[in-house]
């Protein structure tokens, strides 16, 4: 998203038959004169994706579920908190539950510890190859891990996955004994 405010987003029909639409936004860059207008071809992939997610969130039926794969794909890391705040605020106001996936450490860091109860880690069971989902708050070593740094950094360093693997090995050993 641009560093300055987007003042207005709108679409107009275009083309020979007026059957296509073009997205436009007005950005507040100058203190004088009309704001510059940028069409979709001049917007970054991250801006377009952010606007698409916001549109989906605003148009979902109330009390529904919105699932977004790689929610931050194409988005500048500095905008991670803005994206999270929007998803939480607009989702709560509209009664829309939001389920997202990410591999982005910046987004995980922006979640902070207050989101721990809502974070699930997916990894593979080495014995079966199946995906295993683990609630972050169910990791026994989580307090020690969080003392070492934010969630994104822990994930980047492989510490969360390593802790889960250690717990899985310990569970397997208990079953064998």
Features from the language model and the residues they span:
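Alpha-helical structural signal
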Residues: 44-47, 80, 104
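Walker B catalytic acidic pair
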Residues: 69-70
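C-terminal lobe/lid and adjacent interdomain/linker elements of RecA-like ASCE P-loop ATPase modules
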Residues: 82-177
């Amino acid at each position: 998203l641009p560093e300055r405010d987007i003042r207005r987003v709108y679409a107009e029909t275009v083309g020979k038959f007026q059957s296509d639409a073009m997205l436009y936004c007005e950005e507040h860059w100058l203190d004088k004169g009309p704001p510059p207008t940028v069409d979709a071809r001049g917007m970054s992939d991250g801006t377009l994706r952010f606007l698409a997610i916001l549109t989906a969130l605003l148009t979902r039926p109330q009390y529904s579920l919105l699932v977004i794969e790689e929610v931050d794909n194409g988005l500048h890391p500095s905008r991670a908190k803005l994206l999270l705040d929007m998803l939480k605020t607009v989702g709560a106001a509209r009664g829309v539950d939001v389920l997202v996936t990410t591999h982005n450490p910046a987004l995980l860091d922006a979640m902070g510890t207050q989101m721990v109860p809502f974070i699930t880690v997916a990894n593979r069971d080495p014995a079966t190859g199946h995906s295993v989902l683990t609630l972050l708050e169910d990791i026994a070593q989580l307090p020690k891990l969080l003392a070492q740094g934010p969630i994104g950094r822990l994930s980047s360093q492989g510490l969360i996955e390593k802790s889960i693997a250690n717990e899985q090995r310990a569970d397997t050993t208990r079953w064998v004994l």
